[in-house]
């Protein structure tokens, strides 16, 4: 199929809307606080960098509006339920991985059993759509944060897809906690933000998405609560390797870790922003040195599977219905920190991490106490307590997750073997691809998307129909291309970078 230039592409207008900022100087403090007062600003999918090359081809790539079913899902995510979940998890005293697993009211075993019972309660009301399992293994001493053998258990709820059930998307939070001493498994460690907040989102999404009044998703969605994160990402590593060993087709994984507060240690509030960390070049065990060199040669280091997944989230989950801005961070994680998305990346799966915009380290990995602030000398409350959580904010982060997961699960999977022809010196670009792993049953057509090489998100698109090759009059030297499938229901999937 050959597509020549034709049709006028409307000029991309840079949206001028910006957050209204209210600056206030509290009388009792000399610290300026910046508060975002505009709850929503429209998504930016164009930028000055995207103005060249100028082409009269295709159309503007716009954000994807939520479907009727997705709007229903978003409307039912409850801050009160999220708060109740977090307070219940805190009530177990500590959820340290090494803590007791036999006490019915204290320790990680009690938390595990309660999480399982909640998932099972939702499963019982789902008419068989949701199934629940506790999976795990016995971890031996590691010479670091596991001094004696301990059982690592993950609680997993699976919403089986209908249409392409072998394609899987997974969302997780970790239910273990810690205080100042990573090996203190007896002391109180409430872990409200880190990471009861993430577990609360997994539970709430399972509740809402599995209800009888909704259609089944096309692909399978897994909701997980994992253990062992604070001791070395053990639960997530076990889960990722279990899926890899069974050759599972996981096309996207999100972990929600520290999503509980929108307020920084200096009082700065950004209640309508969430960070999404997305890795660049994959690990060498996923892409070998030769593949890595090819990626670098074509300028594809910013178009890894994880970053394509993040672009999809930006395009589908940043809107007035979620009331959130998704700030994509082109980095694996924060400095000196790690998260449960990493084992999935190392297993070869696209994965990314949601985290609040500004962290207060007095409320993470701390013994509960009142102590001096090293900056101000004033007494402050230390500890990861529920009183420092913003439950409305957590529910909005949950909506971002829901929008991304539902759109992913209702759209076709990623095209495979996506190639760009470089056999001749030409000023056009020829592409070939194979259908998604699940075949063409859900596919209504394919789209070529592109952006300027220094633009962060897709700015243009062209529908090329139900084909597996296409040539367009736009030089591959000047832009970054992607190929994505469009569903018969109109839902667009994740784009894939073409390799020579």
Swiss-Prot record:
EC number, UniProt record: 3.4.-.-
Names of required cofactors: Zn(2+)
Keyword Metal-binding: yes
Glycosylation: residue positions: 61, 103, 124, 245, 421, 427
Any single biological process term in GO: proteolysis
A GO molecular function held by the record: metalloexopeptidase activity
Compartments in which it is found: Secreted
Name the record gives this protein: Probable zinc metalloprotease MGYG_02393
Transmembrane domains' residue ranges: none
Entry's Gene Ontology cellular component terms: extracellular region
Cross-referenced Pfam families: Peptidase_M28
Family membership noted in the UniProt record: Belongs to the peptidase M28 family. M28B subfamily.
Keywords, in A-Z order: Glycoprotein, Hydrolase, Metal-binding, Metalloprotease, Protease, Secreted, Signal, Zinc
Signal peptide annotation: 1-24
InterPro entries: FN3_dom, FN3_sf, M28_fam, Peptidase_M28
Stored SUPFAM superfamilies: Fibronectin type III (SSF49265), Zn-dependent exopeptidases (SSF53187)
Residues holding Zn(2+) 2: 194, 230
Organism: Arthroderma gypseum (strain ATCC MYA-4604 / CBS 118893) (Microsporum gypseum)
């Amino acid at each position: 199929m050959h597509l020549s230039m034709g049709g006028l592409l409307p000029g991309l207008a840079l949206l001028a809307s910006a957050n209204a900022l209210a600056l206030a100087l509290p009388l009792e403090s000399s610290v300026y606080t910046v508060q975002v007062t505009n709850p929503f600003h429209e998504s930016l999918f164009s930028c000055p960098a995207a103005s060249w090359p100028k082409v009269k081809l295709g159309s503007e790539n716009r954000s994807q509006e939520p479907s009727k079913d997705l709007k229903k899902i978003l409307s039912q995510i409850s801050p009160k339920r999220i708060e109740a979940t977090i307070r219940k998890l805190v009530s177990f005293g500590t959820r340290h991985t090494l803590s007791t697993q036999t006490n019915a009211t204290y320790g990680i075993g009690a938390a595990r059993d309660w999480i399982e019972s909640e998932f099972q309660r939702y499963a019982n009301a789902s008419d068989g759509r949701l199934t629940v399992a506790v999976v795990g293994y016995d971890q031996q001493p590691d010479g670091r944060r596991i001094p004696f053998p301990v059982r690592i258990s993950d609680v997993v709820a699976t919403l089986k897809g209908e249409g392409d059930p072998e394609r899987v998307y997974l969302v997780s939070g970790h239910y273990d906690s810690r205080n100042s001493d990573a090996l203190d498994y007896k002391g109180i460690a409430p872990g409200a933000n880190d990471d009861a907040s993430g577990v609360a989102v997994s539970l709430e999404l399972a509740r809402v998405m599995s209800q009888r009044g909704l259609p089944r998703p096309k692909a399978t969605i897994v909701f997980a609560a994992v253990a062992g994160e604070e001791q070395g990402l053990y639960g997530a590593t076990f889960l990722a390797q279990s899926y890899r060993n069974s050759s599972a087709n996981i096309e996207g994984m999100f972990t929600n870790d520290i999503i509980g507060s929108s307020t920084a240690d200096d009082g700065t509030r950004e209640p309508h922003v969430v960070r999404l960390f997305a890795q660049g070049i994959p690990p060498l065990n996923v892409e070998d040195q030769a593949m890595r060199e090819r990626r670098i040669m074509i300028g594809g280091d910013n178009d890894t599977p994880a970053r394509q997944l993040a672009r999809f989230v930006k395009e589908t989950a940043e809107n007035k219905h979620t009331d959130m801005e998704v700030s994509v961070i082109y980095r694996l994680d924060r400095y000196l920190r790690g998260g449960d998305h990493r084992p999935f990346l190392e297993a070869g799966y696209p994965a990314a991490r949601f985290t609040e915009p500004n962290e207060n380290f007095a409320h993470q990995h701390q013994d509960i106490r009142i102590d001096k602030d090293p900056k101000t000398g004033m007494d402050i409350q230390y500890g990861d307590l529920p009183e420092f959580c913003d439950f409305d904010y957590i529910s909005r982060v949950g909506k971002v997750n829901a929008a991304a997961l539902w759109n992913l699960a209702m759209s076709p999977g990623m095209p495979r073997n996506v190639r760009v022809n470089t056999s001749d010196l030409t000023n056009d670009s020829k592409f070939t691809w194979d259908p998604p792993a699940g075949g063409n049953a859900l596919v209504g057509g394919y789209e070529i998307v592109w952006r300027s090489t220094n633009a962060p998100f897709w700015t243009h698109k062209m529908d090329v129909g139900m084909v597996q090759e296409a040539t367009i009059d736009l030089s591959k030297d000047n832009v970054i291309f992607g190929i994505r499938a469009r569903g018969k229901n109109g839902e667009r999937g994740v784009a894939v970078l073409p390799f020579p």
